[in-house]
Amino acid sequence: MESTNRFMIGVFGPTGVGKTKLGVSIAKSVHGQVISVDSLQCYSPGGIVTAKPTPEEMDGIEHHMIGYLEAEEEPTNFVAEAVERLEKLCDHGAIPVVVGGSTSLTLPLLRGALNRGWRMAAITLLPHQSTYLGNIESRVDDMLEAGLLEELSGLKSLEDRNLNGKPNFHKGIWKTIGYQELYPYLEAQRSDGHCDELLKSGLASMKENTFQYGNTQLEWIRQALSPFLHAEKIANMSLTVVDKTSWTRGVEKPAIRMASDFCYASTSISFHPINEPKPRVICIFGGSSSGNDPAHMEAAKSLGRVCHENSIKLVYGGGTTGVMGAIASTLVELSGPNAVHGIIPEALLKYEAKESGRHAQDSAFARYGRRTVVKDMHTRKRLMIQEVIDGGDGSGFVGLSGGYGTLEELFEVITWHQLGIHDRGVCLLNMDGFFDGLVNWLGNVVKKGFIGLQDAAILSIASTAEGVVKCLDQKPGFSRKGELEWV
């Protein structure tokens, strides 16, 4: 098989979020097999405590890199063996579905695969914080019912034989969360002591430590995995896992659709070699408020739909409320999170989190696209404008319904065009005459001699979302770009 057809799917996320289940569903849909990237499921013993997939959960899909180590061994050669397994699957015409959340093994494996010419699409599962702890607690309860205590007793016996009865919670299978937490219970059980309280406290610690480990993995995803995927230009869809009732519609279906599109060369996923046109980008300025007329929100959503239909990417101020949130969430829902880039100052991020009652890193924010947090407003403006300047033909700036901030940013890009800093189009979506006063003011400014007709024409006016795209299709009638030397 040629290197250009070496496709793999990555399913990543923290513990207890449903990676195994989704990996199986995707593998079934793309004629694939699963490669597990888990530093504990690779051990032969400890199937329950490490949440190793059961035959029923595998559902006929072959899984690799699971259960091949003895209890006291370490996965020293994991990456080399996993990359070799990728090659073998490729030779047999199977698509590898890499599933895991190991903070130590995942990135080395991905680097090894990419260096060998593999192409990858990634799906990142993010837990909803309102349900995550409860899901983990239920998972531990299920482990208990499945025979957790008996299995841990077996690991204690292995410890006696292989480690001379000296506990080492940093070695082999005994690193797994649950063993150390329930160790006092296992010791007391052997001496016929009172175990009930030790069992209760051990299970509580196991649940809490699993939850904390999941949050550590989430931080790793934010700080290491996501930047890596972005730097390597790997398409990444982030999906929020809430509960079982929303799994099929909110997680499984969009993930399978993305994986299938990627593997079978559908138009939904495309690669952009150097000689292909740059994607078209629009930067929108709009209110963080919804206004008191639903038509303003509908106009924003309409523009989001038109952007999807025309394969236009969006960069905006990163807010999740009002007009800004409406267009961002609409486009993400239709085109995926990579179609939208929100750039928000840290101060506004904290303010919005406080007002909404959500943590600034809440996974619910993923439905508004990728997010970059910057220190100040000036940096935000510079980065947003640069994305439009770097975009393909028809990229430009659009003003939607809003207040002071909307007008301030809109007039800044108009002024930058006037000064020759950029030559992109600037359009105003004048929904139901919302900006009629501004249009009249502009005419009066020309009439009074403060600007000429040429400068007045920098701003174009549209009354519909489709009209906005048509306005930006037309290059501005003049440009002063290059006339002044800007550092």
From Swiss-Prot:
Region annotation Cytokinin riboside 5'-monophosphate phosphoribohydrolase: where it falls in the sequence: 267-487
- Renumbered to this chain, region (Adenylate isopentenyltransferase) spans 1-266
Q: Which UniProt keywords apply?
A: Cytokinin biosynthesis, Hydrolase, Multifunctional enzyme, Transferase
- Chain positions recorded as substrate binding sites: E352, R380, K381, G403, Y404, G405, T406, L407, E408, E409, T415
Q: Which gene encodes it?
A: FCK1
Protein name (record)? Bifunctional cytokinin biosynthesis protein
SUPFAM superfamilies tied to this protein? MCP/YpsA-like, P-loop containing nucleoside triphosphate hydrolases
Write down the Pfam families for this protein, in alphabetical order: IPPT, Lysine_decarbox
**In what pathway does it function?**
Secondary metabolite biosynthesis
The UniProt catalytic activity note for this protein reads: dimethylallyl diphosphate + AMP = N(6)-(dimethylallyl)adenosine 5'-phosphate + diphosphate; N(6)-(dimethylallyl)adenosine 5'-phosphate + H2O = N(6)-dimethylallyladenine + D-ribose 5-phosphate; 9-ribosyl-trans-zeatin 5'-phosphate + H2O = trans-zeatin + D-ribose 5-phosphate
Signal peptide (UniProt feature, chain positions): none
Keyword hit for NADP: no
Entry GO CC:
cytosol
